[in-house]
Structure formats: C-alpha cells, structure tokens
C-alpha cells in the first residue's frame, strides 16, 4: 500500500479552514483529482455518510464509493474509498491550529490489486504531485 502525505500553512483560523476543507460542494475548485460527484451530496456530514465520485490520477479515471469513517470537526475526517478494479483509497484530512492560522494536511493511502507493481508506483508519484498542487490550490481559492 502506498502512503502519501502533504501539508500547507493556511492563513485562516482552523474553524474557517475546516469549513472549506469539509465542504464537498467545492472540491472541484481545488482538489485536482476530484472530477465530479456521482451521488447526491448530503446536507450534513457525519460518520457513516456515503458518497460517490469520479477521481482521476495520471489520466486514469475511477469511480470511488466513499464512506466517512471518522468525522471530528474542526480537526479532521477520514474517508475510506472502494473503487473499480479493487482499488482501495483512504483519505485523511486534518486541520490543526498554528500561530496566525492553521495547517491543512492530507494523507492518502492507496491499495488493491490494480495498484500493485509498477502501475502503483506511477500512480503514487502522480498523486504526490496532485496532493501538493491541491493544497496550494486550497490556499489560493480560500485565502488568496
């Protein structure tokens, strides 16, 4: 299983950073791998919430069924994803206070038979760049 992490300083108070990081309706604006939601988004997020989306890494799209397995505002949430071809994804989003703002971080764990071997390494490398770009987009969109 590939594990990738990234974080960025955000000049917003943690509560505001959390509000944006947990707003699924705005993921298309900053999260580069997110393409479109394939299910109706709930009005309230909570543990057990299920949503579906298309994600794309290195030109390879996949439909992912996400389940929120941890939801603790304004600190973080964890989504477990099951995709086509046995792809498994875990997305851990965290917001922590920092002097003059907050730190927003994402950890992504990738696994499943479709991501074994060289393909998995290629996807992991591309996703590492996507995480960095997404975090920078987050700052630009919400604090720029």
UniProtKB/Swiss-Prot annotation:
Q: Answer yes or no on keyword Protein biosynthesis.
A: no
Keyword Transcription regulation recorded = no
Matching entries from CDD domains are given as: SRPBCC (cd07812)
**The organism sits in which domain of life?**
Bacteria
> Which keywords does this chain's UniProt record carry?
Toxin-antitoxin system
- One of the GO biological process terms: negative regulation of growth
InterPro entries, per database record? Polyketide_cyclase/dehydratase, START-like_dom_sf
State the protein's purpose. Toxic component of a type II toxin-antitoxin (TA) system. Upon expression in M.smegmatis inhibits colony formation. Its toxic effect is neutralized by coexpression with cognate antitoxin Rv0909. Does not exert its toxic effect via translation.
Instruction: Quote the protein name from its UniProt record.
Output: Toxin Rv0910
The organism named in the record is Mycobacterium tuberculosis (strain ATCC 25618 / H37Rv)
């Amino acid at each position: 299983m590939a594990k990738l992490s990234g974080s960025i300083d955000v000049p917003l108070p943690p509560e505001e950073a959390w509000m944006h990081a947990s707003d699924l309706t705005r993921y298309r604006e900053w999260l580069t791998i997110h393409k479109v939601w394939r299910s109706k988004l709930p009005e309230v997020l909570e543990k057990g919430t299920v949503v579906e989306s298309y994600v794309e890494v290195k030109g390879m799209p996949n439909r992912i069924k996400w389940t929120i397995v941890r939801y603790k505002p304004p600190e973080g949430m964890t989504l477990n994803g099951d995709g086509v071809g046995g792809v498994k994804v875990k997305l851990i989003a965290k917001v922590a206070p920092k002097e003059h703002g907050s730190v927003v971080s994402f950890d992504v764990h990738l696994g499943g038979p479709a991501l074994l071997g060289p393909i998995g390494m290629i996807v992991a490398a591309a996703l590492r760049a996507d995480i960095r770009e997404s975090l920078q987009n987050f700052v630009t969109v919400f604090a720029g």
